Amino acid sequence: MRTARLVINPAFAVGPVRRRTFGSFVEHLGRCVYTGIYEPGHANADDDGFRTDVLDLTRELGVSTVRYPGGNFVSGYRWEDGVGPVEKRPHRLDLAWHSSDPNTFGTDEFMRWAVKAGIEPMMAVNLGTRGVQEALDLLEYCNVPGVSHLAEQRRANGVDEPYRVRMWCLGNEMDGPWQIGHKTPAEYARVAAETARAMRMIDPGLELVVCGSSSRAMPTFGEWERQVLTETWEHVDMVSAHAYYWEQDAGLQEFLVSAEDMDRFIDQVSATADAVGAAIKSDKVIGISFDEWNVWYQDRTPSRPPTGDDWPVAPRLLEDNYSVADAVVVGNLLISLLRHTDRVWSASQAQLVNVIAPIMAEPDGPTWKQTIFHPFALTSAHAKGDVLRVVIDGPTIASQEFGEVQAVDAVATWADDEGTVFLVNRHENETVQVEIDVPAGCRLVEAVTLTSDDPRWQASAEDDTTVAPRANDTAVLDGTRLTADLPAISWTMLRLAR
């Protein structure tokens, strides 16, 4: 068995663990909203029509923020359709996903759900088919406490106090040709800058996210960020990044090192933002909102929207069923986000329920946990204090795209007298033993590993417990030397205290 050596020291702090790293995403797409978080008439629905079983799992997952209402959906959305008396709301076509929306769930319903879920709302405005005025109207409806027309409309709809939403996304994936209202970098930069400037006239304390690239593979990546940030620099706080990964023709081993791409993506966006700041002699730091990320098998049938005259409400779309290998990759992506906590200020796993999601909810039926639920929930629960830089020296994997990369990847966090190490063994065949130098006086509190002899195993409504994190009995702490065996294709959490 080969060995990887790691050093953990509370002095090697990268930055604070940000609770916003553990965000999620609710879009009017497939069954995420309707028969997902919202299903009036379900046995577990509360008086607002919210599924309490989904709410319970959302809290167990440890979600901190939720981005709403999209996604591609937002670029054709008229927010006014989703407020006011439900019986008067229009039924609209959703061009993004070739579906239709009855608008029985809208802004006020989402805000009520957010309170019950204990999450911070992150709103997106439509800069595809709409612009500055419509964004200002939504902001006024949500945040203004006075006697303005839209504040009064909110009160008439039963909400006296403003929602005071802090984080706002200025559109969605405007670099993508698939986006309704797709724009060039110059076109988008101009409308984003004007929208941001005007929104701050209403509420100077907003945290605004400008659209970055939809993936590192986009042909405009880099140049898009440069042009957009040059125009919007003084008006925004963060730039978005989106990335999805799935096993492709290169095979399982290449898929298992997907986090190498996320690392490079974050580093390159950071470098581009810093270069823009240097060019204009600004000391301001632009953060990254990695507000769409996950494993998503985009080449599979569930990802294909309806066609022709079929415009269903809440069709089954993007309902990927995740394997153990997928869960290991998700755990590794969380490691990447954490170790870049100095630049990643917010993140949203896409999405929360039913649609490429950790939570599944059957119509008129039960909920169940996908494999990817576990690394997210445990990382959210136990990543506290500061993120520590981890030095790794161990066996490597020959990646087709990234060259030689470490088989074991890891990050650690430390808060007061307790620390946690999150690790993945990305080798598809070999167990690797880790030897970790830890601070003196520690004791081992918990060691759990998620793995399976069958890395293709998937959970279902009938069985979501056969494969879950289990105690790793190989973990031993002897003085300042912590050892543990990491099976091939596994995710592990080691908790320490002193």
Can you name each region flagged by the protein language model?
Residues 1-224, 229-238, 262-263, 267-301, ...:
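Non-catalytic accessory regions flanking glycosidase/transglycosidase catalytic cores in CAZymes
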